[in-house]
Amino acid sequence: MSEIVLSLEDVVAGYGRAAPVLRGLSVPVRAGEVVCLVGPNGAGKSTVLKVASGLLAPRSGRVLLAGRDVTGLSPQRLLGLGLAHVLQGHSVFREMTVAENVRLGGFTVRDQARLTARIEAVKELFPVVRERWNSMAGLLSGGQQKQVEFARALMLEPSVVLLDEPSMGLDPRNTQVVFEQIDLMRRTGVAVLLVEQNARRALEMADLGCVLDLGRVHISGPARELAADPRLGRLYLGGAPAT
């Protein structure tokens, strides 16, 4: 079994003085695996990503990255330690070229040879980046822009990538491409913590599924088994699985 590269341990977190959204949540993420968070609206899925990425400090509990306690560190510090975050929606800079967008992901790389090597690596992973390198990012389709975001996130060779609703607003064909690219990340050894509106499809390709309810992990287990469970389908996944 691969090592745990990201771990949220007994996390309590919320916003302002309101009641906590996360109430003692624990989630492990192993190297080269996709962990998918599912559950009803308000269960705390996106809050988990905010805590993991440093956007929201927990009230209690710990976040460990490669065994190191990184609770409360800024997103910039976490990026330098190997954790990247692809935000919900489209975060490309539309008035910049694909090349300029991708290079932003390597802004801390001072060694030109290493920077060139990373650019070639992401071009190999994401063909649209190579093909549209000098195009304005705003001219790309939604699915192509998402691939540019993935490429930018991988420029610093993170061990963990957080993905928040990566297929939001995409048609079925581009959604399929996004899932293929997530699988490609996994096969390169990157760990992925995923929140996805297309919950059943995400569980079918993930390794571990965690069903959140009322700020806790209600059920966890092999993701494909959860996707096929008719009880979970009715409660959380928009109906029973097709037979």
What are these regions (language model features)?
Residues 16-17, 98-117, 125-127, 221, ...:
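ABC-type ATPase nucleotide-binding domains, specifically the catalytic core motifs of the NBD
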Residues 38-40:
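The feature captures the beta-strand-to-loop junction immediately N-terminal to the Walker
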Residues 53:
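Helix-to-loop junction immediately C-terminal to a conserved catalytic motif
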Residues 61-68, 81, 114-119, 221:
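Conserved ABC transporter NBD signature motif
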Residues 136-140:
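Conserved ABC ATPase signature
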Residues 153-154:
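ABC ATPase C-loop
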Residues 157:
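Conserved catalytic motifs of ABC-family nucleotide-binding domains
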